[in-house]
Amino acid sequence: MNSRALRFAGPAILAAVALVALVGSLAFGGGAAPLLVGDPGPVVRWMLPVAQLAVNLSAAVMVGALVLALFGLRAGERPFEAAVDAASVGAAIFTVAAAATAYLTFLNVFNATPSAGEVFGRQLGDFLVGTELGLAWLLTTLFGAVLTVLTFAFRGWTATLLIAALAVVALIPMATQGHSGDEADHNIAVTALALHIGGAAVWVGGLLTLTVVRGHLDRERMLALLRRYSSVALAVFVVVAGSGIARATVGVVSWEYLVSPYGAILLTKVAALLLVGVLGAVYRLRLIEGIRTAATAHRFWWFIAVEFAVLGLASGAAVALSRTPPPVDTTLPLPAVRTPSEFLTGAPLPPEFTLQRWLTMWDIDLLWLFVVGFGLFFYLVGVWRLHRRGDRWPIYRTVLWVAGLALLAWVTCGPMNAYQDYLFSIHMLGHMLLTMAIPMFLVVGAPVTLAARAIHRRTDGTRGGREWILWAVHTPFAKLVSHPLVAAAVFIGSLWLFYYSDLFRWSLYDHLGHEWMVAHFLISGYLFVQSLIGIDPVPLRYPYPFRLLTLLGVMAMHAFFGLAIMMSNALFVAEWFGSMGRTWGPTPLEDQYVGGGIAWSVGEIPTLILAIVVAIQWSQSDERAQRRADRHADRTDEQELKEYNARLAALAERDARAGR
């Protein structure tokens, strides 16, 4: 299969197999069956999933092409331009498909008859801006339109990176669709679906982009690109598989689900993904090197065509699965009246928080579980690389990095994540650990220094992990936020702004707000600690006395913040914490008082440790400076001291002559 044929055959195979799989799965599972009440008609029932499939595939092209361009190609050259061109086309199709999905979803939900009348237009407008479902698709369409313009207009390194970040954000509203919003474990379902969509987009879109740029690269450069894509694909396969398992665990209530049409489609999708994983392992381990010769290269690209077919099967089954109603478990009791906790959080009230539950209660946050897992894996791989080539890496840095990640996992996936929606004090304890304790461990682990030493340097003008990390560290924005004064201001200002504004309310009501809160406070704490005791390079490092003064100021503001909460008689987000219906533990106001005490006392402990570390580093810095001065004096036979004494003697002699 030549380059031109594969450029068109790859997307055609993917789209055709996906469409056939979609139609077959819908017919088998009843996802497009007529509704007993309010049926919108066969056109809407069949065209809506087709439009959703177009959204998914075009999103994959848009995201995957940008990611592959950033990590595998060189800006300014024709292959890079071709990849971004593919992203532009994908964004344009994504916009049209999202708009069509929004329109068809409106017809499906409201059973409206299309017309050019004012009433129909007003109903459509109310749906798009007045309902969560309509707003999600409206935002998706607007994101697509903006991305279409940006991908056509900008092609540099930085611009493409920002556009790629926006493209990933554009996928978030899609994660609220399907069955995710209806399930009891809503947060897990939404997070799993978001990770699943994002990972699949990078995987499928990257593979499509390989066929697009193949004709613009010689065999050696194509071989290098395939290796880089293979590494990225391996990482996203882990994400797609892990999130898919979590998503299926939420959706499949019992094993009987698997013998239903819903279960059959689910198993088909799982089998297709596993097969793609096997195919990926085969070409990673055995076939990539074969593109050096024409005969084996021909076999390799036919192998890729087969992978497109299997990915099409998985893509079609995935869309059909989101439209197929799961079986009803008749053995479950009828739902009782919803409790206040279920009304607010979507989950029943957990059991009383006891000492035992500090170690036994878990509530997994899939996003941070992946962050911890990848952070641990890549760090240990970096240490192993240094050890293998004979370089030394202090063991204490590795131990502290692992301890920091373990503490992060415990905070985001353990008892604090399970009880923070119900107890303000637990929420505050988790916040203090995120901003103060965890960053201390991670900063001393020096991940940037390790990455700079362990990741292979690119010599062909492309950018890999090492190049992007070093670029990020030296950007003007990084210089601004890592400035000690700015880092301290963001660190302490965020504390007050978050709790005394609607941001706190947003983090409770919206899972996206919760994830933003965790990321923001972890990063702000990391930047603050890095500016004080960091080992990694920073644009500006203030003198030690100034660092201690900064810490004293932060300690004072922390104390004021904690005291303000303890002295307050007004309950934070009273309609949440005051309406939870807890029958155990302290009252909401008493619990808030405890939370204020935690902010004052527990928050000061890491600050005190930081002050001790800064003082120790100051002392060690003075000792190193003295040793350098002593070595310099030994090398020069104390020539500077002799010259200084000679000048003093000359001045004394001159003064003596003047006195006579």
Give the residues covered by each predicted segment.
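Alpha-helical membrane segments of multi-pass proteins
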Residues: 1-660
